[in-house]
Amino acid sequence: MHTLIILPGNSVKNRQWGEAVLEHYREQFDATFMLIYDHWETGEETMEFSKEVKKIEKQVNDWSNSTDITIIAKSSGALLALLAINQGVIVPTKCVFFGIPFDLASQTVFKNNWSPLKEFNIPTIAFHNDDDPVADYAFTKKTIEEKGSGNIKL
């Protein structure tokens, strides 16, 4: 079974992005799933990563070990994917990331523990705008090169 997981960015505006990606790729997968973040419903400004990792774990617990998982994630969703993978919650066969805000995550999400990036072993392609208003491209590129395992191609 080939399953697609969509992890949108932090802002509730990214829900529409996730739904569009889900709709676009739905026919190419046996199953699709988009995580709806709790803070979108409560009105809080940012996601609580540990809570969202648990929601991913609950979702995938019922899936067969033979499920082939692809993750498409945007911004904070990419950070969430890195954390969930590092914690062994999910083991995708490939990932596609759009805009990874490592500069924002270094203190708040990773707390200068870069093991989710250093130990990352999933073939991944990442896209990042040169003029990204949220996450600096140069910092993202440098972080992937210096702290990454070599599995994320920017």
Q: Residue locations for each model-derived region?
A:
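Acidic catalytic loop of the alpha/beta-hydrolase fold
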Residues: V12, L104, D130-A135
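Short beta-strand/loop motif that positions the catalytic acidic residue
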Residues: F120-N121, I125-H128, D132
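Catalytic histidine neighborhood in serine/cysteine hydrolases
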Residues: D30-F33, E145-L154
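Serine-hydrolase catalytic machinery in alpha/beta-hydrolase-like enzymes
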Residues: M1-I69, L79-L83, N113
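Short alpha-helix in the alpha/beta-hydrolase fold that links the catalytic acid
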Residues: G18-A20, F110, D136-E145
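A conserved short beta-strand
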Residues: I90-D103
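Conserved serine/cysteine hydrolase catalytic core
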Residues: Q107-P123
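Active-site loop->helix "elbow" adjoining a glycine-rich segment at hydrolase catalytic centers
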Residues: K74-A78
